[in-house]
A protein has these predicted regions:
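Conserved phosphate-coupling serine/threonine residues in phosphotransfer and NTP-handling enzymes
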Residues: 4-6
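Asp-based, Mg2+/Mn2+-dependent phosphohydrolase catalytic module
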Residues: 8, 12-109
């Protein structure tokens, strides 16, 4: 699932352009939660929509407020670093990867 602070229509547009819309079983945008991150609502809603316990999910994030939301939801959080967040201390993350490419490489190995 994708649970994002962006609007669901924008997420679907991006996925459609990448021919990846059918790969995602659930898309939750900012309109699907009463409160935005750092509150856990959107992540808890995603787990509920998938029919699985939050602890059986994981969150990919690049922001501290997303990490805090995942922690509050009881969902392990993996941080993907980028130029904007490299100096942030993500000490409460389950794992931190220097890039999306490094995360993908770890999945493939």
């Amino acid at each position: 699932a994708i649970a994002s602070g962006s609007w669901a229509t924008d997420i679907k547009h991006i996925l459609r352009n990448a021919n990846a819309l059918d790969m995602v079983p659930a898309i939750l945008g900012k309109e699907s939660a009463k409160r935005e991150k750092p509150f856990p609502d959107i992540f808890l809603n995603a787990a509920k929509k998938l029919g699985i316990a939050p602890a059986e999910c994981f969150v990919l994030e690049d922001a501290l407020k997303g990490l805090n939301a995942a922690n509050e939801a009881g969902i392990p959080c993996i941080i993907l670093q980028n130029e904007l967040n490299r100096n942030i201390d993500f000490k409460n993350a389950e794992m931190v990867f220097p890039s999306l490419a490094d995360f993908v490489s770890a999945l493939e190995s």
